[in-house]
């Protein structure tokens, strides 16, 4: 099953404009820098790739945190870009990283509490925002975007590191079944949070201070990033590209096993596809990923990595990949693997500098703990 991509928008560590971000990808830029969100000197990972521009002022800031505000912004922009309006046949499919009780909210509220709960309100609970529970509803951004845009059709909210792929796959199925005529898909996530950095360090997933690219001989972990992206899918009409997507899970506590990637890649990838890799920068995983993908695409398929430029962006990954790969294929250019110095041996051909391409299709892969994976395939009309 595939659907026509007709509108798109994003907020990324490389910028907010489509052309701006694609130009920076082709220039081989990396957004990684010392954490600009908060003082991270006491964390194992001090680097981050963050969105520079703040969300626009919004009355919804009472109910939405920063990333949720970006999500509502890009949803509206993608609808305008596609030239479509809300209605009963417009569905909304949201993917986000999952519920997180943020430490900056909870620590002031609980650091002076007693074991018996005596005086809990005076000891800190009064410091919680009165809308704290409402701010942590899983479908907050979905509900507000649906109200703002008049999207009254079928839809769903998905959670987890591969929620963007889940949302894309769900939207494409809804279009194929005739449940909606237009599907707005939004993915948003930030790995640049104190609680997330602690978890990534415990898993050994995030880089410390020595920055090396994925698929590099010196790779030793990824840079945490963040993004919000939205695209509009339709069953017919003038398409920028056609999109397919799948998600999967294998129950692993850490990164998914190669067998899961084999199933996903075997289901929708084709010989001759260009490849945008997961970019986890974990040598054993990177090597296994390349072998599994090359079995389908061929050993000489070009390998780029948008996440090397932007950092790992969790639930937003597949949506960002779909937008970026569509733009790159239309330009007939593929970006270099940002930051790559010495490519590790293996199948697939890491792209060292921006190059012209005649490829008309590409796949984008994503993976994260616990055992979650996604794939998106983009094909020009």
Region annotations inferred by a language model:
Residues 2-11, 18-35, 40, 206-277, ...:
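Condensing-enzyme catalytic core mediating Claisen C-C bond formation in acyl metabolism
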Residues 4-5, 26-149, 154, 191, ...:
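Conserved beta-ketoacyl condensing-enzyme motif
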Residues 10, 57-76, 98, 133-134, ...:
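Active-site pocket-shaping loop/turn-to-helix segments
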Residues 18-21, 106-109, 197-201, 288-292, ...:
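Short, glycine/charged-enriched secondary-structure capping and boundary segments
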Residues 81-95, 108-130, 147-154, 177-184, ...:
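Structural signature of cysteine-dependent C-C bond-forming condensing enzymes
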Residues 99, 190-196, 248-256, 340-358:
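Short, mixed-charge aromatic SLiMs
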Residues 151-152, 157-226, 231-233:
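Internal metal/ion-chelating core segments
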Residues 187, 279, 366:
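Residues that line or immediately flank small-molecule/substrate-binding pockets and catalytic motifs
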């Amino acid at each position: 099953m595939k659907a026509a991509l007709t509108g798109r928008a994003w907020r990324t560590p490389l910028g907010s404009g489509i052309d701006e971000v694609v130009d920076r990808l082709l220039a081989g830029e990396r957004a990684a820098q010392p954490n600009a969100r908060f003082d991270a000197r006491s964390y194992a990972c001090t680097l981050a790739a963050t969105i520079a521009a703040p969300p626009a002022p919004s009355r919804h800031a009472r109910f939405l945190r920063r990333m949720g505000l970006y999500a509502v912004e890009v949803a509206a922009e993608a609808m305008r870009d596609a030239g479509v309006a809300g209605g009963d046949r417009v569905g909304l499919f949201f993917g986000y990283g999952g519920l997180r009780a943020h430490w900056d909210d909870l620590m002031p509220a609980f650091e002076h509490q007693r074991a018996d709960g005596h005086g809990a309100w005076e000891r800190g609970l009064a410091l919680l925002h009165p809308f704290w529970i409402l701010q942590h509803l899983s479908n907050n951004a979905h509900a507000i975007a649906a109200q703002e845009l008049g999207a009254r059709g079928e839809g769903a909210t998905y959670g987890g590191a591969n929620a963007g792929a889940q949302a894309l796959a769900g939207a494409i199925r809804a279009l194929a079944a005739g449940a909606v005529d237009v599907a707005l898909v939004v993915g948003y996530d930030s790995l640049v949070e104190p609680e997330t950095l602690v978890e990534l360090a415990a898993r050994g997933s995030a880089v410390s201070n020595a920055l090396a690219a994925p698929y590099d001989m010196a790779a030793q972990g990824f840079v945490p990033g963040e993004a919000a992206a939205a695209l509009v899918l339709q069953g017919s009409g003038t398409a920028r590209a056609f999109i397919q997507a799948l998600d999967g899970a294998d129950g692993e506590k850490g990164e998914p096993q190669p067998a899961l990637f084999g199933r996903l890649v075997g289901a929708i990838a084709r010989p001759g596809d260009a490849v945008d890799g997961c970019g986890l920068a974990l040598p054993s995983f990177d090597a296994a990923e390349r072998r599994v993908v090359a079995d389908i695409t061929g050993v000489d398929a070009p390998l780029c990595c948008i996440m090397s430029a932007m950092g790992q962006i969790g639930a937003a990954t597949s949506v960002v990949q779909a937008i970026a790969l569509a733009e790159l294929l239309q330009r007939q250019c593929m970006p270099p693997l940002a930051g790559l110095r010495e490519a590790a041996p293996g199948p697939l051909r890491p792209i060292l500098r921006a190059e012209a391409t005649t490829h008309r299709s590409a796949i984008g892969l994503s993976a994260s703990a616990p055992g979650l994976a996604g794939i998106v395939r983009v094909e020009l009309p």
